[in-house]
Each structure stands twice: as C-alpha cells, then as structure tokens.
C-alpha cells in the first residue's frame, strides 16, 4: 500500500469523523498556539499591544474612508444642485413674458 495514499485517507477520516476528539485534533493542529520554534519553545500569537495597535489603525482607516464617502456624496449633491440651478436660470432667461399679462382683468372679490 502506498504510504502517501494511506496518509490521505487518514486526513479524510479526520475531517469526516463525527467525534469531537477528531475535530479537536484538527483545530489544535492548525492554530498559532501549536507552532514550535527551532529551540523548542512554543511561539505564542501576537501580543496584546500589537493587537491594540492593529485595532486603532483599522478604526482610523475606516473613519477616513467613511469621511471620504460622506464628503464625496455631499459635494456631488452640491454640484448637481448648482448645475440644476444653472439650468433653471437658463430656462428662465429664454422665457418671454406673454402679451396677455397686461390684459388681466381684476374684478371685485
């Protein structure tokens, strides 16, 4: 029997098994806590300070992106408003008063 093929079936059996022990072994094998360095000491995950710095950087980036979107929408709306006012003024200039404006009869109420 080919040893590589047997290893593949063991891995498939590990993932297809319904027991909690097999799932626990799979999770334990793939976490950062299980990494061992060359000198035999286990290397832990990222420390608390670097996690805090990463979180602050993520918040700052999200704030900058949010402000960019808000101001982009605001200035786009202002630009469209200015253009629409210009188009209205253009239409108003082309309109001429009717000759019938002077012929309005005002009666008693």
From Swiss-Prot:
Record carries keyword Transit peptide: no
Coiled coil (residue ranges): none
Membrane-spanning residues: 56-76
Membrane topology annotation: Single-pass membrane protein
GO biological process: regulation of cell cycle; regulation of mitotic cell cycle
Subcellular location(s) of the protein: Cytoplasm; Membrane
Residues modified as Phosphoserine: 98
Sugar-modified residues: 7, 18
Family to which the UniProt record says this protein belongs: Belongs to the reprimo family.
Function: May be involved in the regulation of p53-dependent G2 arrest of the cell cycle. Seems to induce cell cycle arrest by inhibiting CDK1 activity and nuclear translocation of the CDC2 cyclin B1 complex.
PANTHER family in UniProt: PROTEIN REPRIMO, PROTEIN REPRIMO-RELATED
Name of the protein in question: Protein reprimo
Organism: Homo sapiens (Human)
Biological classification of the source: Eukaryota, Metazoa, Chordata, Craniata, Vertebrata
Gene: RPRM
């Amino acid at each position: 029997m080919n040893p590589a093929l047997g290893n593949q079936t063991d891995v498939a059996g590990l993932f297809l098994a319904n027991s909690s022990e097999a799932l626990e072994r799979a999770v334990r094998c793939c976490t950062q806590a299980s990494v061992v360095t060359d000198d035999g000491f286990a290397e832990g995950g990222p420390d608390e300070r670097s996690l805090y710095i990463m979180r602050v950087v993520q918040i700052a980036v999200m704030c900058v992106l949010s402000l960019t979107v808000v101001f982009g929408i605001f200035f786009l709306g202002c630009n469209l408003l200015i253009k629409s006012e210009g188009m209205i003024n253009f239409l108003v200039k082309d309109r001429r008063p009717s000759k019938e404006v002077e012929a309005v009869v005002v009666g008693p109420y």
